[in-house]
């Protein structure tokens, strides 16, 4: 019996080892409570993720929770009641312990009052924070409050889930921000390294581009050299060996083509035959043009024979107008002059002083000219016909001429004569009139009207400006740059002024002479007869002049001149006003006043004034025709080449009124151009 009891107790112990109440109280309670909490958490998580809150789901969860609660209640009851209430018949027999005492078969020493007490104490001192759960357990004793506890549990775990969810998202955001800040701080912590890396990359790219450009340029240079060499080879093959002769041939052919084209164009324009009627039409057209463009008063020269002579400017104007009328393609629109005819009275001061320059009415001039053209119409027609025939013959001969010969060359003798003629022409432009601004002509300096000399200058006195030496190109008088630097002279014999000029050098390095050169020069004159001063002043006031000099009121301002350093002419003329020329006053002394220079504020540099004029004795000789006017060839200032070239021809047919400037229009020497350092003014 004892063996059977022991066997039964072993089976009961093995079967009851799996039950929570067969374990230690503390561990059993913790396992059951943990299992329940895990199941409730899994159920709430699945419900939140899937969003299943239907009635069926709530029912299932409620059944599962009910089963769990019943198991938990059973465990509690087993703890409160002894295990003697069972229907097993085998357990009715008392169990005899080793000590001889009888006990029930299912009694256990573990389930004593002390065990219950220890279970309660262990549950109160449990390490888990389950105070709320212990309260929850007490409330489960009543079945009416179980349902409320279930919903509170759901709300609690749902709130806990949301707290964990937001806390996790906050942690993730914080981590990301920390990563970004660490990244930015890491980026900003090493700006030098980033800049150096960028600089290295840029330098590398620049070096690559430079190498590429050098490579392309070298390849381009090689290609260009090859092309140029090939081009030179091809050109050398095409060009003849003697390039000079080839160039001469090309020039000759070009001239032939130009000549042929000119002759053809002229022949096309002149396709009509010259007749007397055409000449009459030209005459009528010429008269109309003269009537339109000529002024109302025509200046002419009347010599001793009372014959009318036109001045050279009018002669040139008529020649150009006649050529324009003849060469025009149509008669009706031919001969339109570009501008009105103008002339300069400064060229005819001598003729005005001798009363040879007079004015006639335009109608009388045109009538006289028309009468002479009418009487010589046949002669003009014959002359034109002969000239055209001669020109056509020359053109035909020129076209048929062989230009393959050696081009013509100038003779060395002809070249020497041409150079000699140019030299004489230039020299004669300087020597054709006396310079009265020299002390050798008796002119004296007026010290009381002359400005003081600049003390820090070269020491040249104003009297040096009266020297007659052409070698004194470096002689410059420097006066103080006071308001109006003056230089005054007095003639030995009163003069009729014909031309006044000033001469100043051109220097490349000595710029203090250039910026102190006079720019604006005023001319003051004192008349020989005091009774004419008032008339001169009244006339000058009408043209904006007539002011008195600040040091002497007897000197009257008649002109103002601007000397231009930009002009290549070193000798520039101070033109006399026409009203002064027509008044014909006799001048006793002159004052030149420099109103402005080219920028020097300390001093003004003056070199040379040239004054040309005629005396009353010269006019008397001209009026009486006591000495013939010498015209023709230019006088020889150098060595004569033969006796015939040095002769002066006396042209008695020419009127005695012509001056040197006027006579140069009638001989070839005046038309020869000047060159080099000998270039002088016209």
Curated annotation (Swiss-Prot):
<keyword id="KW-0158">Chromosome</keyword>
<protein>
    <recommendedName>
        <fullName>Spindle pole body assembly component MPS3</fullName>
    </recommendedName>
</protein>
<keyword id="KW-0812">Transmembrane</keyword>
<keyword id="KW-1133">Transmembrane helix</keyword>
<feature type="modified residue" description="Phosphoserine">
    <location>
        <position position="189"/>
    </location>
</feature>
<dbReference type="GO" id="GO:0030474">
    <property type="term" value="P:spindle pole body duplication"/>
</dbReference>
<feature type="region of interest" description="Disordered">
    <location>
        <begin position="641"/>
        <end position="682"/>
    </location>
</feature>
<feature type="compositionally biased region" description="Basic and acidic residues">
    <location>
        <begin position="1"/>
        <end position="12"/>
    </location>
</feature>
<feature type="region of interest" description="Interaction with JEM1">
    <location>
        <begin position="431"/>
        <end position="650"/>
    </location>
</feature>
<feature type="modified residue" description="Phosphoserine">
    <location>
        <position position="190"/>
    </location>
</feature>
<dbReference type="GO" id="GO:0007129">
    <property type="term" value="P:homologous chromosome pairing at meiosis"/>
</dbReference>
<dbReference type="GO" id="GO:0016020">
    <property type="term" value="C:membrane"/>
</dbReference>
<dbReference type="GO" id="GO:0034399">
    <property type="term" value="C:nuclear periphery"/>
</dbReference>
<feature type="region of interest" description="Disordered">
    <location>
        <begin position="1"/>
        <end position="23"/>
    </location>
</feature>
<dbReference type="GO" id="GO:0000741">
    <property type="term" value="P:karyogamy"/>
</dbReference>
<dbReference type="GO" id="GO:0034087">
    <property type="term" value="P:establishment of mitotic sister chromatid cohesion"/>
</dbReference>
<feature type="binding site">
    <location>
        <begin position="187"/>
        <end position="194"/>
    </location>
    <ligand>
        <name>ATP</name>
    </ligand>
</feature>
<feature type="topological domain" description="Nuclear">
    <location>
        <begin position="1"/>
        <end position="154"/>
    </location>
</feature>
<keyword id="KW-0547">Nucleotide-binding</keyword>
<keyword id="KW-0175">Coiled coil</keyword>
<keyword id="KW-0206">Cytoskeleton</keyword>
<dbReference type="GO" id="GO:0034398">
    <property type="term" value="P:telomere tethering at nuclear periphery"/>
</dbReference>
<dbReference type="GO" id="GO:0000743">
    <property type="term" value="P:nuclear migration involved in conjugation with cellular fusion"/>
</dbReference>
<comment type="subunit">
    <text>Component of the linker nucleocytoskeleton and cytoskeleton (LINC) complex composed of at least MPS2, MPS3 and CSM4. Interacts with HTZ1. Interacts with REC8. Interacts with CSM4; ECO1, EST1, JEM1, CDC31, NDJ1, MPS2 and SIR4.</text>
</comment>
<dbReference type="InterPro" id="IPR045119">
    <property type="entry name" value="SUN1-5"/>
</dbReference>
<keyword id="KW-0963">Cytoplasm</keyword>
<dbReference type="InterPro" id="IPR012919">
    <property type="entry name" value="SUN_dom"/>
</dbReference>
<keyword id="KW-0472">Membrane</keyword>
<feature type="compositionally biased region" description="Acidic residues">
    <location>
        <begin position="87"/>
        <end position="111"/>
    </location>
</feature>
<feature type="region of interest" description="Disordered">
    <location>
        <begin position="82"/>
        <end position="111"/>
    </location>
</feature>
<dbReference type="GO" id="GO:0005635">
    <property type="term" value="C:nuclear envelope"/>
</dbReference>
<dbReference type="GO" id="GO:0043495">
    <property type="term" value="F:protein-membrane adaptor activity"/>
</dbReference>
<dbReference type="GO" id="GO:0005825">
    <property type="term" value="C:half bridge of spindle pole body"/>
</dbReference>
<feature type="topological domain" description="Lumenal">
    <location>
        <begin position="176"/>
        <end position="682"/>
    </location>
</feature>
<dbReference type="GO" id="GO:0034993">
    <property type="term" value="C:meiotic nuclear membrane microtubule tethering complex"/>
</dbReference>
<dbReference type="GO" id="GO:0045141">
    <property type="term" value="P:meiotic telomere clustering"/>
</dbReference>
<dbReference type="GO" id="GO:0005524">
    <property type="term" value="F:ATP binding"/>
</dbReference>
<keyword id="KW-0597">Phosphoprotein</keyword>
<dbReference type="GO" id="GO:0000781">
    <property type="term" value="C:chromosome, telomeric region"/>
</dbReference>
<keyword id="KW-0779">Telomere</keyword>
<keyword id="KW-0131">Cell cycle</keyword>
<dbReference type="GO" id="GO:0005637">
    <property type="term" value="C:nuclear inner membrane"/>
</dbReference>
């Amino acid at each position: 019996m004892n063996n059977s009891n022991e066997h039964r107790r072993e089976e009961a112990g093995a079967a009851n080892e799996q039950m929570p109440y067969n374990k230690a109280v503390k561990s059993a309670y913790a396992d059951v409570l943990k299992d329940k909490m895990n199941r409730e958490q899994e159920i709430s998580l699945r419900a939140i993720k899937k969003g299943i809150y239907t009635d069926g789901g709530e029912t299932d969860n409620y059944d599962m929770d009910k089963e769990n609660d019943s198991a938990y209640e059973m465990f509690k009851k087993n703890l409160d009641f002894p295990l003697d209430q069972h229907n097993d018949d085998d357990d009715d027999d008392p169990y005899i312990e080793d000590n001889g005492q009888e006990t029930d078969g299912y009694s256990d020493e573990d389930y004593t009052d002390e065990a219950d007490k220890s279970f309660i104490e262990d549950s109160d001192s449990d390490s888990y924070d389950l105070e709320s759960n212990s309260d929850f357990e007490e409330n489960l004793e009543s079945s009416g409050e179980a349902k409320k506890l279930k919903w509170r549990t759901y709300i609690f775990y749902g709130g806990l889930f949301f707290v964990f969810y937001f806390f996790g998202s906050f942690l993730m955001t914080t981590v990301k921000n920390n990563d970004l800040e660490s990244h930015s701080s890491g980026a900003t912590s090493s700006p030098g390294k980033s800049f150096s890396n960028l600089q290295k990359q840029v330098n590398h790219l620049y070096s690559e581009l430079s190498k590429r450009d050098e490579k392309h340029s070298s390849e381009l240079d090689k290609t260009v050299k090859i092309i140029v060499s090939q081009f030179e080879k091809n050109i050398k093959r095409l060009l003849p060996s003697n390039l000079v002769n080839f160039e001469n041939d090309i020039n000759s052919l070009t001239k032939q083509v130009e000549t042929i084209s000119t002759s053809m164009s002229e022949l096309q324009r002149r396709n009509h035959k010259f007749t007397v009627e055409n000449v009459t039409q030209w005459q009528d057209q010429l008269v109309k043009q003269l009537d339109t463009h000529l002024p109302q008063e025509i200046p002419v020269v009347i010599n001793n024979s009372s014959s009318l002579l036109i001045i050279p400017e009018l002669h040139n104007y008529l020649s150009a107008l006649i050529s324009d009328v003849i060469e025009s393609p149509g008669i009706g629109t031919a001969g339109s002059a570009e501008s009105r005819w103008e002339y300069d009275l400064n060229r005819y001061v001598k003729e005005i002083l001798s009363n040879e320059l007079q004015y006639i009415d335009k109608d009388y001039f045109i009538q006289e000219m028309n009468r002479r053209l009418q009487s010589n119409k046949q002669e003009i027609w014959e002359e034109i016909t002969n000239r055209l025939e001669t020109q056509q013959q020359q053109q035909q001969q020129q076209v048929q001429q062989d230009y393959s010969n050696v081009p013509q060359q100038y003779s060395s003798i002809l070249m020497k004569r041409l150079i000699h003629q140019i030299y004489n022409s230039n020299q004669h432009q300087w020597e054709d009139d006396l310079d009265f601004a020299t002390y050798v002509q008796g002119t004296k300096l007026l010290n009381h009207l002359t400005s003081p000399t600049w003390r820090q200058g070269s020491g040249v006195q104003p009297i040096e400006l009266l020297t007659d030496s052409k070698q004194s190109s470096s002689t410059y008088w420097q006066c103080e740059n006071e308001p109006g630097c003056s230089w005054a002279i007095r003639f030995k014999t009163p003069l009729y002024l014909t031309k006044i000029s000033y001469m100043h050098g051109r220097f490349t390095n000595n710029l203090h002479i250039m910026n102190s050169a006079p720019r604006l020069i005023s001319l003051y004159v004192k008349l020989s007869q005091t009774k004419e001063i008032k008339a001169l002043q009244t006339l000058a006031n009408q043209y904006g002049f007539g002011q008195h000099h600040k040091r002497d009121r007897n000197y009257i301002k008649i002109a103002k001149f601007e000397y231009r350093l930009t002009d290549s002419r070193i000798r520039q003329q101070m033109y006399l006003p026409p009203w002064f020329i027509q008044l014909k006053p006799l001048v006793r002394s002159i004052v030149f006043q420099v109103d402005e220079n080219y920028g020097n504020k300390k001093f003004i540099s003056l070199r040379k004034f040239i004054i040309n004029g005629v005396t009353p004795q010269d006019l008397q000789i001209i009026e009486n025709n006591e000495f013939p006017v010498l015209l023709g060839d230019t006088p020889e200032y150098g060595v004569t080449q033969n006796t015939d070239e040095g002769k002066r021809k006396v042209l008695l047919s020419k009127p005695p009124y012509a001056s040197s400037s006027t006579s140069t229009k009638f001989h070839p020497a005046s038309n020869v151009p000047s060159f080099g350092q000998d270039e002088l003014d016209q």
